[in-house]
């Protein structure tokens, strides 16, 4: 759907499927993303995130289904799609013998930008992604993993795309670099109306940036909505109970099944979801006392995206915003 300037920045997918042998990496996904949104796409490793991005960016063909990007069919009009999008994937592909400025200028000139403007653009983009103070003679092959990711993002922005696909763009970056990327993503969306499709394993990143979020698990969308709506569906408040051992937590999970049917156990903790948590605390304590289970701590808090993720996938998303995750293994590259 076109915006008021007649520019289509939307993304749609209908009954999208991609198989790898007997593995359904993407299994019947439907999406409708209006232009001008930041769309967060979450899921465990191997859930289908990167596979769907590769379909939408014309890198992979779907086994079945249909998708459009910027109004163009990804299978029938792949060239038009590629003209309209910028892409920064997990698998960074840079010429190791070229410098950052050479790569940016080459990319810019390939899109028809005059050389003097290409040079100015290269400097601006290097500053944007925090690489402007790197030795200009340093070749991309000598860059660290985080530096390569930042350069890849800069390359994706060279032609001012309508839609930007970012596949875990801040993975492996330090907190300061991550914050700079967040600021640039928000600026691109606020000032240019750019649609941004963001896959991430950082829940705080999705919560801060995304207008809407979808969670994929085993190739299927299991939850979708605004961050606040998804958290509201979990419950208005969360009671977290802490115990001295995993065995005590497991016993408490059984003892509280009738009192708190909506709950999640993990290690020595038990999280229970209520409309009004404080009103239920006395009954929880009585039930634990009656079962002879010693409680070591109790807190009441608002639900987070961690709670949403845990509820719909049955597992926690371990990567936190201040602890960059390790590199993905080869299996994750194919199906994540």
Predicted regions and their residues:
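Conserved catalytic motifs of ABC-family nucleotide-binding domains
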Residues: 160
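Conserved ABC ATPase signature
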Residues: 139-143
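Catalytic Walker B motif of ABC-type/P-loop ATPase nucleotide-binding domains
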Residues: 164-167
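ABC transporter nucleotide-binding domain
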Residues: 183-275, 299
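Conserved ABC transporter NBD signature motif
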Residues: 65-73, 81
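Conserved ABC ATPase "signature" region
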Residues: 105, 109, 117-135
């Amino acid at each position: 759907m076109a915006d008021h300037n007649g520019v289509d920045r939307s993304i749609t997918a209908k009954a999208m499927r991609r198989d790898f042998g007997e593995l359904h990496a993407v299994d019947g996904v439907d999406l409708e993303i209006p232009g001008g949104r930041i769309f967060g796409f979450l899921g465990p490793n191997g859930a289908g995130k990167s596979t769907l991005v590769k379909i939408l960016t014309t890198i992979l063909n779907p086994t079945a289904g249909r998708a459009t990007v910027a109004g163009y069919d990804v299978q029938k009009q792949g060239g038009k799609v590629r003209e309209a999008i910028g892409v920064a994937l997990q698998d960074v592909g840079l010429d190791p013998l070229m410098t950052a400025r050479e790569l940016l200028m080459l990319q810019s000139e390939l899109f028809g930008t005059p050389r003097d403007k290409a040079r100015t653009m290269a400097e601006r983009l290097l500053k944007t992604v925090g690489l402007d103070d790197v030795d200009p003679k340093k070749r991309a092959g000598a860059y660290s993993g985080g530096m390569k990711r930042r350069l890849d993002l800069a390359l994706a922005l060279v032609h001012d795309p309508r839609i930007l696909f970012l596949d875990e763009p801040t993975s492996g970056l330090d907190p300061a670099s991550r914050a700079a990327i967040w600021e640039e993503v928000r600026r691109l969306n606020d000032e240019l109306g750019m649609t941004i499709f963001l896959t991430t394993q950082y829940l705080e990143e999705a919560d801060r940036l995304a207008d809407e979020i979808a969670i994929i698990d085993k190739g299927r969308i299991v939850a979708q909505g605004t961050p606040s709506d998804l958290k509201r569906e979990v419950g208005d408040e969360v009671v977290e109970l802490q115990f001295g051992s995993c065995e005590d937590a497991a016993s408490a999970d059984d003892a509280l099944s009738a009192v708190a049917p909506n709950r999640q156990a993990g290690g020595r903790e038990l999280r229970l979801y209520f409309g009004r948590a404080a009103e239920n605390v006395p009954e929880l304590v009585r039930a634990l006392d009656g079962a002879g289970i010693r409680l070591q701590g109790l807190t009441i808090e608002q639900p987070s995206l961690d709670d949403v993720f845990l509820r719909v996938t049955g597992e926690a998303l371990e990567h936190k915003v201040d602890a960059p995750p390790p590199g993905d293994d080869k299996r994750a590259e194919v199906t994540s």
